[in-house]
């Protein structure tokens, strides 16, 4: 029976491992959606207010250029992931790339997308520092604990 697989990813090596896992371990009959949630910085980059902190105002152009570069890296990673799945036998028409701006939060947005008829969420374990993970938690941890009525597979 074919499944709908949601691969939550960014441009990290850990995320790409989840794509490799699906390519090796799941039937090519399945439908795969490569899903990414981007932080929506457009409003911040277009902000023209005298109340902006002078330090931020002076760095705004550099910040927005970095955000544009991040968007390019994510797009390239998603295309590379699709190519890997197609080379593993998945039909190109059964591998979709879906990039959305953050709505409620990255983990909550992944869980909201998962409610659209997916059978499993696959994602990489995020390699963040122990201290940062202690205070903020990782996206994969939040998805794992927040998932209801759907399996979550975390690639290491």
Model-derived features: positions:
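Small/aliphatic-rich secondary-structure junction motif
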Residues: 2-64, 88
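Amphipathic coiled-coil/heptad-repeat helices and related helical stalk/stem segments
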Residues: 15-18, 106-107, 136
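Short conserved AdoMet
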Residues: 26-28, 90, 115, 147-148
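Conserved beta-strand termini and adjacent loop/short-helix elements that scaffold enzyme active sites
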Residues: 35-37, 98-102, 155
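Low-complexity, serine/threonine/proline-enriched polar segments
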Residues: 68-73, 77
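Structural beta-alpha unit
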Residues: 79, 83-120
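Gly/Ser-rich helix-loop-strand patches that form or flank binding pockets
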Residues: 112-156
């Amino acid at each position: 029976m074919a499944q709908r697989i949601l691969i939550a990813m960014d441009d990290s090596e850990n995320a790409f491992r989840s794509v490799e896992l699906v390519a090796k371990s799941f039937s090519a009959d399945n439908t795969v959606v490569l899903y990414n949630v981007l932080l929506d910085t457009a409003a911040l980059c277009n902000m023209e207010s005298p109340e902006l902190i002078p330090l931020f105002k002076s760095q705004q152009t550099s910040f927005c250029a970095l955000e544009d570069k991040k968007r390019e890296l994510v797009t390239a990673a998603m295309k590379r992931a699709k190519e890997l799945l197609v080379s593993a036998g998945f039909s190109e028409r059964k591998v979709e790339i879906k990039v959305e701006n953050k709505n409620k939060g990255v983990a909550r947005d992944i869980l909201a997308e998962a409610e659209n008829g997916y059978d499993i969420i696959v994602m990489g374990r995020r390699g963040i520092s122990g201290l940062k993970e202690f205070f903020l938690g990782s996206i994969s941890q939040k998805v794992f604990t927040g998932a209801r009525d759907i399996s979550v597979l975390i690639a290491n």
